[in-house]
Amino acid sequence: MNQEVMNLFNPQVPAQNFDSIRISIASPEKILSWSYGEIKKPETINYRTFKPERDGLFCARIFGPIKDYECLCGKYKRMKYKGIICEKCGVEVTLSRVRRERMGHIELAAPVAHIWFLKSLPSRISTLLDMTLKDVERVLYFENYIVTEPGLTALKEHQLLSEEEYMLAVDEYGEDQFTAMIGAEAIYEMLASMNLEKIAGDLRAELADTTSDLKQKKLMKRLKIVENFMESGNRPEWMIMKVVPVIPPDLRPLVPLDGGRFATSDLNDLYRRVINRNNRLKRLIELRAPGIIIRNEKRMLQESVDALFDNGRRGRVITGANKRPLKSLSDMLKGKQGRFRQNLLGKRVDYSGRSVIVTGPELKLHQCGLPKKMALELFKPFIYARLDAKGYSSTVKQAKKLVEKEKPEVWDILDEVIREHPVLLNRAPTLHRLGIQAFEPILVEGKAIQLHPLVCTAFNADFDGDQMAVHVPLSLEAQLEARVLMMSTNNILHPANGAPIIVPSQDMVLGLYYLSILNQNEPGEGMAFSDLGELHHALESKVVTLHTKIRGRFKSVDEDGKPYSKIYETTPGRLLIGELLPKNGKVPFDICNQEMTKKNISKMIDTVYRHCGQKDTVIFCDRIMQLGFAHACRAGISFGKDDMVIPDAKAKIVADTENLVKEYEQQYNDGLITQGEKYNKVVDAWGKATEKVAEEMMARIKAVEFDEKTGRQKPMNSIYMMSHSGARGSPNQMRQLGGMRGLMAKPSGEIIETPIISNFKEGLTVNEYFNSTHGARKGLADTALKTANSGYLTRRLVDVAQDCIVTHVDCGTQTGLTMTAIVDAGQVVASIGARILGRTALDDIDHPVTGERIVDAGKMILEPDVVEIEKAGIQSIRIRSALTCEIQTGVCSVCYGRDLARGTPVNMGEAVGVIAAQSIGEPGTQLTMRTFHLGGTATVVDQSFLEASYEGTVQIKNRNILRNSDGNLVAMGRNMTVQILDERGVERSSQRVAYGSKLHVDEGDKVKRGQRLAEWDPYTRPMMTEVAGTVQFEDLVDGLSVLEATDESTGITKRQVIDWRSTPRGSDLKPAIVIKDASGNIAKLSRGGDARFFLSVDAILSVEPGTKVSQGDVLARSPLESAKTKDITGGLPRVAELFEARRPKDHAIIAEIDGTIRLGRDYKNKRRVIIEPAEDGVEPVEYLIPKGKPFHLQEGDYIEKGDYILDGNPAPHDILAIKGVEALASYLVNEIQEVYRLQGVVINDKHIEVIVRQMLQKVEITDAGDSTYIVGDNVDRIELEDVNDHLIEQGKKPAYGDPVLLGITKASLQTPSFISAASFQETTKVLTEAAIAGKTDGLQGLKENVIVGRLIPAGTGGTMTQIRRIATSRDEMILEERRKGTGAAVATPMLQDMAEKAPAAE
């Protein structure tokens, strides 16, 4: 029997094994070698017989038989004629499957250009020929001739000639004196005659000579393509095709529908057009038709081939019968519906089902309820096998009948089959890895899947009609992985932040909170209980309540495992919770002897997990859930309208604020403040009022009241219980119900000045209702838009990080990042402990006073160490980071630190990149889906003061302080910092003070925690004088540079600087305020410059000419923008902007060196700012700043490297160039974290660091050394290291480069793997580039392996790959030894050697 047939029944035949995939341009010979025959006719199938036409697009002679082992005319049927070619119809007798793999070809009568190389920008053909794309197209589409060989004529090579010019030239020089051609033949000749080596040499020489940047870029582009061709072995003329391949017919099917019509793939239409035009052209050439007709036909052939390869790339889109554009070969690959994303990366699988989910509170954590009907269908093959094994059926048919009849024995067998066979549950959208978990199925009646309540958080599921899908892992390995890695009991911690995710929520929290409440004066107060039995008895007989204050004995074990018992002041309810705690010395009763809010419950579960291990935690979680549900039910907590308390003080607060607002209106009418300032103040006043009302309301709701008759404490307010416990609702929602609704935002994000004074209990007026709908509607619209954006962000993140895998244990690097606590507005938002937990220490950490060792270098910082470090008051710690890891591919385990989802050091082969991407992307969607919960209620708090966050002594760095005429201390320095030192002189905090701030402390003062250090006006920025004297104006011309606005209602004027460059007359002005001394001369500043203060647009003057001013007085104020509400809507685009490394619109200008400011000569409408360097041997740096921009520095100010010359958001590229990688990392991490923090989402820094690492993979060459690189090349970091190693070995000069920051999209498209890049975006461009360079994909990342259908090189797949690699090299060595004839004896010790060296063995 034939081998192929044997293989059918023996699937264990290994697939072809390959290590890499190469892509290159196909030469005409190559295309012919693939082909099984030429297609000569455009016919497809015969419409009567449905048989394919001979030599047509479906020809059976070329592509193979339609039915297995049967030729077309029916002469040979059956297996026995296999391989025979029928002499009548010419069809080979074989499997019809070959119609999916055999290709054909079309011989073109005239060459045509491949549209990818022509039109995919930058055009490869035109770059190579050094012509413009327009010119190349003119030649290709038969508009102009091109001179290929000028001979001795006056014509130039590559000169374009129109028809008339060509005729004139022929008349003038004669036809044989020069060669001019037209069409693809011309381009073919030019490409074929190129001497690539010579061109490359010329280009390099020219590059060395040229100085212009633009020219350099152009030459480099061309040189790159020339070198690509030389290295890959492709020939340039292959970009012009003489033969077109035809893909196998079963990949472009033609299916007869009923009613005599056909459904066909668009490709058949496109191929038909090509064949028709090609045949017509052949006929015209044979007939010797006039040149113009032939030329037209050639142009049409070129267009039809273009449409076949990439429809719509050039000219009109070719449409089918129904005006729909035809799908070309490129469209088959591109986009979400293309081959890559639809069929290779995402496949539909069998053995799956989906149904609605309902809650299953009586399940264990590792179980799910599976409907019987569903299980019967999903496990059918297993049931058939078991029925056969037990002798109930002898054939599959019989088994099928038994199952269909649902005989009782079938149900018994189903029970056996399902036992301990895990199934996977998945809820779409799967935003992180916890969206798919494994459970053991329990058969249930009905048609709904039952889900354990505790895993709802991970799936983000609720029971309002959500559906979930079930998948059955079939092979033993798959079942093993499902059980060991994916079981819900193995996913207790959240991979994003390491906190427990199996945490009770809603009812369970409420029940536990109710249990743990302690009330005064309850019956039985002060009783003592010796054990839990007595307690239960007392509760049953109602001698005590759950909330009575009692003394109870709690029994547990100490740290050595010895049992002990201790008496606590507690309540019966808390003892009931304590009863469930696992017995462990590290888990004391104190963790549940408190009010059990959601936070405390989470901490409790975390403690249990860290000290008692997984099994105990799972059992504990299940019990605590049962307890919570039971008591939530028994407590019977509900709420009515009277639970929403409206505070009595509300009316007074509102009245006071209304008076205040009236006062502001009056001030505005009197011209004391501007419209913008009034707006800010009013918004601020209402914001404060809302807060006050909320505080009053909370105080009322929280208040403990006692019953006069019984003296017992009244039950707590239900709404307060729900909110405070964390079960449902937030103080914000309570405020809207019982306080006042507050300020609302317009859809544009601005805040409406009039707030909503009513709350929902009182009801809104029509006006208020209308205003509130604004915000609510914006919320809903945002939600819809943001979900898509967030999904796209996640996709880009996954794509950039997918090949970041833990590949080694330790890279041994000496570099890392410095971690400090993050302080925002005087509040510590992220403590140093939280940031370093689970990271590896880079240096030894010693106690600053006693000097004793806390953590050794290279060891992980664990929970006890964090406590020690925070006690010791250490401010900054150097840690290892994935960002500075020196492993070439992937990262090492030590740099990454703790695997957050397991709480142990990260395992080899963990796909940390994907986990990072999911951790950052998942909350993006969560948040955006939740925007409307705030109903657009505005929250404006502009910080306007500094508070001491520690106790200690003040020290002021770069001190520059004056006392103004009011006797206040004023900060005059641009980069002053107030530091607080503790009694040991260790710096505890350091905060920048804004210019113009009023200081409450000075050097050497002692401060208490929470004391005000400084304050400033958050709405304007002052300009102050540091010398006393008389004011004089310069260039402040009415109507040109300053506008005197008289307020009509008040008649008071104020002066505001306007944009003076808008008129030609004003273009030379430099508006300024000058201070003159007593003798009438311009006063001198302490630094030696003149006291001349330049003004920016929109500045409001605070002085008149002739005003006497003293030091520290304000001359003018620049208003800052009005406050906008913060909402993740601003957040998500912000995160995307940071990851894409886009330059912000008005980005800050950052000083590159330390030095003093000097103002140079202005340039057009820009101001020239020069920094004179502080140290010698450094060139001064100059910046041009648009004149209207608020520029706050004065001549002579000292500025440090990294300070802002012009305010704004800094461009990440500048931070990288000026301050280096570490500063960039901390900037990106902090900015991204800020967005998430605002929404209360905790993400560990290391995830963001992993992504930033992927963005810093490229290096720009600054010095090429002896390498083949050119200065300005963007090279892979790893590649550069390899090249340099080789250069140094040969004693040559290595190349140097600076790190380049790429946005995530760019970084994804520039991965070494072209398969991964092509499946991401811009498929045609990526494949074109890869083909020209003849790229090889080494299948390193996850995506490319999924696409070619192998196990991913991470996790269990990675281990298999390692083992396979060792085995292969071992076999090679043994064969090598055999060849040498020394036998295999020597190979064994070498083998052990290799196994030790292999990374897997680590």
UniProtKB/Swiss-Prot annotation:
Reaction catalysed by this enzyme? RNA(n) + a ribonucleoside 5'-triphosphate = RNA(n+1) + diphosphate
Report residues binding Zn(2+) 1.
Answer: C71, C73, C86, C89
Q: What is written in the cofactor note of this entry?
A: Binds 1 Mg(2+) ion per subunit.
Required cofactors, per record?
Answer: Mg(2+); Zn(2+)
Q: Does the keyword Nucleotidyltransferase apply?
A: yes
Q: Which Pfam families match?
A: RNA_pol_Rpb1_1 (PF04997), RNA_pol_Rpb1_2 (PF00623), RNA_pol_Rpb1_3 (PF04983), RNA_pol_Rpb1_4 (PF05000), RNA_pol_Rpb1_5 (PF04998)
Q: Which superkingdom is the protein from? A: Bacteria
Catalytic activity, EC: 2.7.7.6
Which residues are recorded as binding Mg(2+)? D462, D464, D466
Q: Which GO terms describe its biological process?
A: DNA-templated transcription
User: What are the annotated GO cellular component locations?
Assistant: DNA-directed RNA polymerase complex
Where, by residue number, does Zn(2+) 2 bind? Answer: C811, C885, C892, C895
Matching entries from SMART domains are given as: RPOLA_N (SM00663)
Q: Which UniProt keywords apply?
A: DNA-directed RNA polymerase, Magnesium, Metal-binding, Nucleotidyltransferase, Transcription, Transferase, Zinc
Q: What molecular functions are annotated in GO for this chain?
A: DNA binding; DNA-directed RNA polymerase activity; magnesium ion binding; zinc ion binding
What InterPro entries does UniProt report for this protein, alphabetically?
Answer: DNA-dir_RpoC_beta_prime (IPR045867), DNA-dir_RpoC_beta_prime_bact (IPR012754), RNA_pol_asu (IPR000722), RNA_pol_N (IPR006592), RNA_pol_Rpb1_1 (IPR007080), RNA_pol_Rpb1_3 (IPR007066), RNA_pol_Rpb1_3_sf (IPR042102), RNA_pol_Rpb1_4 (IPR007083)
The entry assigns this protein to a family as follows: Belongs to the RNA polymerase beta' chain family.
PANTHER family membership:
DNA-DIRECTED RNA POLYMERASE, DNA-DIRECTED RNA POLYMERASE SUBUNIT BETA
NCBIfam families named in the record = rpoC_TIGR (TIGR02386)
The protein's assembly and partners: The RNAP catalytic core consists of 2 alpha, 1 beta, 1 beta' and 1 omega subunit. When a sigma factor is associated with the core the holoenzyme is formed, which can initiate transcription.
Reported function: DNA-dependent RNA polymerase catalyzes the transcription of DNA into RNA using the four ribonucleoside triphosphates as substrates.
Q: What is the name attached to this protein's record? A: DNA-directed RNA polymerase subunit beta'
Species this chain originates from: Rhizobium johnstonii (strain DSM 114642 / LMG 32736 / 3841) (Rhizobium leguminosarum bv. viciae)
Q: Give the gene symbol.
A: rpoC
